[in-house]
Amino acid sequence: MGYFSFVLCTAAPCTAPLGMETRVIKDAQITASSEWDLNHAAIQARLHFKEDGDKQGAWSARSNDANQWIQVALGSYTKLTGIATQGRNANSQWVTKYQLQYSDDGVHFHYYKEPGQSSPKVKPQQSDNFKSLHACRPTILQLTN
């Protein structure tokens, strides 16, 4: 079971977050392939999301396999320079690696690749539940609308 929280940034070194933590990005903009249950919903994929009653402090997919995804629809073209990830609050649970995809129509997605590489970049996750920033070089200029 993987836990994942992140923030999308507009300027290196992540000085202008897009709003995953502050909720500028609304719950309706966040979807996922599956959720463990309502207490581990996609809308809980926010940095520093705190456990609150039944809410468990992170998104968790129903299945532990490579076919799980989480999507943030930004609504317009956005320059993305990095992604911050974080494990589940107050627990020793986190994603160990992930791949990033982007789209300009929400239907056709492209894997993020580093310059000169033909294979999708596998982003490593930290080995603890503290926040970790992963730069996107080159930056991504288009995301789902």
Show where each model-derived region lies.
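Trp- and acidic/polar-enriched beta-sheet ligand-binding modules for extracellular glycan
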Residues: 57, 64-69, 90-145
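Disordered, acidic Ser/Thr/Pro-rich linker "stalks" and the adjacent N-terminal cap
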Residues: 4, 8-75, 88, 115-117, ...
